[in-house]
From Swiss-Prot:
It comes from Methanococcus vannielii (strain ATCC 35089 / DSM 1224 / JCM 13029 / OCM 148 / SB). One of its GO terms (cellular component) is plasma membrane. Keywords: Cell membrane, Membrane, Methanogenesis, Methyltransferase, One-carbon metabolism, Transferase, Translocase, Transmembrane, Transmembrane helix. This is Tetrahydromethanopterin S-methyltransferase subunit C. Pathway: One-carbon metabolism; methanogenesis from CO(2); methyl-coenzyme M from 5,10-methylene-5,6,7,8-tetrahydromethanopterin: step 2/2. Part of a complex that catalyzes the formation of methyl-coenzyme M and tetrahydromethanopterin from coenzyme M and methyl-tetrahydromethanopterin. This is an energy-conserving, sodium-ion translocating step.
Amino acid sequence: MSHGGGGHAAELFPENQVLVIGAVLSLIGMYIAHFVPSLAMLLGGLLAAGACVAGANTTRRVAAYGLGTGVPSIGMVSLGMGTISALAGVLIPSVLAGSVALPFDLVLATPIIAAVVAIIVGFIVGKLTQNPVGMKVPIIVSSMTKLSLMGALAILGFCTAFAGGFSADLIINGAINNGIIALAFIAAGMSILHPFNACIGPNESHKRTITLATACGLMAWLVFSIAKLDIVSILVAAVFWIYTYGSFVSMSLADACEVKYVPELPKKE
């Protein structure tokens, strides 16, 4: 049943479980991309899609409280918070390395630092939406925190996959100066906001929404693979996306009470 008429079906997968899986997969993907650059796009890009799926799942839950047109907006807020946090995670180690003597390479903690900053930023933004903004959604603080985290992991995950690592020099030259971070913002943002926005309604199904979220995450990976001109990743991502999106279409046709196909447009009035 929906909260506030938002069109939210019963949960098949616990939100926190999806969140943990998405976060762990994206973190693993970033470390693979950093230590094995030859597999950066193939595995790093694939696993970055996990953050998109988890973010889309959280969007589904918070949007069920009747956000209406706020469904796309909250996705953009997620990536706004995520971008700030990802950049902070990349730059903080390089700044501290020049001023503080540490017994280990702080660069290796970049994804973790980005995640911590994202949680803090999301919590603050969530509190601000309660006061002074005045939103009455009871889970808004926790949801903003989770969306900020998933936004940061998605942004940093795809940028790391493209750049071949998450050190400041690699990200700045391989993802920021060339504008790839803007592509990450749009691709990951659409993957997080679109699934529930497309499936919302009285017949919304958690399984169908998650399937579309997976397809959107895989499409983001495909877009990055094409931008990188990584042939193997392009082929694998295309196969995965076609299969997943085909599954979503099949579910939609099966769940629909009636399917009407658009006829051929008349050649004359």
